[in-house]
Design a protein with these regions (language model features):
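Bacterial N-terminal signal peptides that target proteins for export
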Residues: 2-13
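C-terminal motif of bacterial Sec signal peptides marking the signal peptidase cleavage site
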Residues: 20-23
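Bacterial signal peptide processing site
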Residues: 25-28
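Tryptophan-anchored aromatic micro-motifs
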Residues: 32-47
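N-terminal glycine/threonine-rich, aromatic-flanked beta-hairpin/loop signature
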Residues: 49-92
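An anionic, turn-rich surface loop/hairpin at beta-sheet edges
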Residues: 87-112
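Short, exposed beta-strand-loop hairpins at the edges of beta-sheets
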Residues: 108-129
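Short, solvent-exposed mixed-charge patches
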Residues: 132-133
């Protein structure tokens, strides 16, 4: 009888642990897009190219963070539709977004390539190439 009670207690504890662990975090909703991406190259529509140092896009849920290490960090909202990425940076200034390949506080990017390691975004203003960091 005691063995049956101990077995039931262990079963209940195991179920509770599984429930607690599974409830602790948000699952990624954007597939391969979620994570931190380092900008490797920006090709502007004008033909100019730039290879920024230590500039990143971080994507999680419906939030995007643009960060240039020791310089700036901008946070906004984004919507991922599979072939497009819509970014809205409501409190940012345009001049703060230029180093990230954006020329406005609202930007639509076409997703030209997306794998677990490589991302290419295209807007009317620039083409951005990233590697997963």
């Amino acid at each position: 009888m005691m063995t049956l009670i101990n077995t039931k207690k262990r079963y209940i504890v195991a179920v509770l642990l599984v429930l607690i662990v599974s409830a602790c975090g948000k699952m990624p909703i954007n597939g391969d897009l979620d994570g931190r991406w380092q900008i490797m190259k920006i090709e502007y529509a004008s033909g100019e190219e730039e290879m920024p140092e230590r500039a990143y896009y971080s994507v999680a849920l419906h939030t995007i963070n643009l960060m240039k290490v020791d310089v700036t960090s901008q946070t906004g909202n984004m919507e991922y539709t599979g072939d497009s990425l819509f970014v809205v940076m409501p409190v940012s200034k345009v001049e703060d977004l230029l180093p990230f390949g954006m020329n406005g506080t609202e930007q639509r990017f076409g997703i030209k390539e997306l794998t677990s390691k490589h991302l290419v975004l295209q807007s009317d203003y620039a083409r951005l190439e990233f590697r997963k960091f």
